[in-house]
Regions:
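Intrinsically disordered, low-complexity regulatory segments
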Residues: 1-120
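C-terminal or mid-to-C-terminal helical accessory/interaction module adjacent to the motor/catalytic core
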Residues: 51, 96-171
Length: 171
């Protein structure tokens, strides 16, 4: 209805800078976030709307990444001191139909910390594995791009299998 203003973040609004130390394993994996340059325009729209709102509904995707986006938006607004005396709700729906949206709005919940933790663990691993393995990969295989937590393990499995095939001696 007219009492709602719908704004998009267009995905994640913050990320880990690609410098060393963005994830600190010695400090309980503390992460240093920075606002994504693409997101600055959309964050301004969100913060401007939040200033004039009594209630903020975070309706990102109903998965780990969506939960993280909702958490980042809430944290960002909190850092800007825009949440005082405001009601914050997390709304999820699995389809974009009038019935599903109304049901979601009528059944709000809080941000799910376990989903946010799952995102944090995934992001920390992506950062730590990629940040530490990619430079080694670049020196050994010039022209290669990067190494991630999933592709590195998959590559290891493939090379182990290739070694088994090469060393196979038929009886």
């Amino acid at each position: 209805g007219d009492e709602y203003k719908v704004l998009a973040s267009y995905g994640h609004i913050r990320d880990l800078p690609s410098k060393n130390g963005s994830v600190d394993p010695d400090q309980d994996f503390k992460m240093q976030w920075e606002v994504d340059s693409f997101s600055k325009k959309y964050l301004k729209e969100i913060t401007d709307a939040a200033k004039d709102s009594s209630k903020i509904i975070l309706a990102t995707d109903p998965d780990r990444e969506g939960e993280a986006i909702a958490w980042h938006v809430k944290e960002y607004l909190n850092e800007k001191k825009l949440l005082k005396d405001k009601e914050i709700e997390r709304v999820v729906f699995n389809e974009i139909t009038k019935k599903a949206v109304i049901h979601g709005i009528q059944n709000p919940r809080q941000i799910e910390p376990l989903l946010v933790d799952a995102y944090m663990a995934r992001r920390a691993l992506d950062y730590l594995v990629g940040f530490n393995i990619s430079p080694i990969l670049w020196t050994k295989l010039p022209g290669s791009k990067s190494a991630g937590r999933v592709q590195s393990v998959a590559l290891k499995l493939i090379t182990e299998r290739e070694h088994q095939i090469e060393s196979f001696k038929p009886e």
